[in-house]
Regions:
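Short, conserved phosphate-binding/catalytic loop or strand-edge motifs used
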Residues: 173-181
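Membrane-proximal, proline-rich intrinsically disordered regions
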Residues: 21-69
Length: 233
């Protein structure tokens, strides 16, 4: 081999080695949470079940502390500057509604519940299932996921209740929708059909959800839907 070829070959070898080392020492950080990872993770599913409650109305705060009864003849709210009086004086309209965006908020909650019900079956618990020392943890997590599904069904029923008491019959949608879903295929269901759906979902939830006095982990389940909530609705 000619002498001048040796430095060239050595240089090429060093380039390959240093390039490979650079990949090992400076790996690309994976910052994207994929849909698949989110669906199989128990902790992410827990977080998503909690997120379903974020569409509930904010108690008495979204109407300046007034109850909805003050929008009718049932009650009178004494704070004269409160937004609730917009109903009484007739100053509210589609762009200025003291009740907020009830249509958007409740349908977002319904769509989130539909997606949760579909994807909560994909949680990967095999690492517990096949570990003889983790059988109790495995069963507890299965039970939790099962309960969260019925919480989601109750919340979906509640969001439909919030819609029908304002708008009457609305489309009953129980499957997840994507960006390419054709919304024109959905029509308005009758009020009686909506009420039957709400009652059926609440009956199913009440048969599974626990009463507050029978909860075993009250601290971590405070504020979640219960048997009493489903029966009350």
């Amino acid at each position: 081999m000619k002498p001048y070829k040796i430095p060239v070959i050595v240089g090429l070898l060093f380039s390959v080695v240093f390039y490979s080392c650079d990949d090992l020492l400076d790996p690309k950080a994976e910052t994207n949470l994929t849909e698949e990872f989110a669906n199989v993770s128990y902790n992410n599913t827990l977080a998503r079940s909690i997120g379903l409650y974020s569409y509930l109305p904010d108690g008495l705060s979204y109407l300046d502390g007034a109850m909805m009864a003050a929008a009718s003849d049932e009650a009178e709210y004494t704070l004269e500057t409160a937004s609730i009086h917009g109903f009484n004086v007739g100053s509210w309209n589609a762009n200025n509604n003291p009740d907020g965006s009830a249509w958007e908020r409740n349908f977002e909650g319904i769509f989130a519940a539909n997606l949760f019900l579909k994807e909560s079956d994909e949680v990967d618990l095999d690492y517990l299932k096949y570990d003889p020392t983790k059988q109790q943890d495995y069963q507890n997590r299965l039970n939790n996921i099962h309960r969260w599904k019925y919480e989601a069904r109750f919340l979906r029923a509640y969001y439909y209740f919030e819609l029908v008491k304002r708008y009457g019959g609305v489309p009953i949608i129980t499957e997840p929708l994507g960006l390419k879903s054709d919304l024109s295929t959905f029509s308005r269901d009758s009020l009686s059909a909506c009420i039957r759906f709400i009652v059926s979902e609440c009956d199913s939830a009440a048969a599974v959800l626990q009463a507050p006095d029978r909860m075993t982990d009250v601290a971590n389940n405070l504020g979640r839907a219960t048997k009493g909530a489903a029966m009350g609705l």
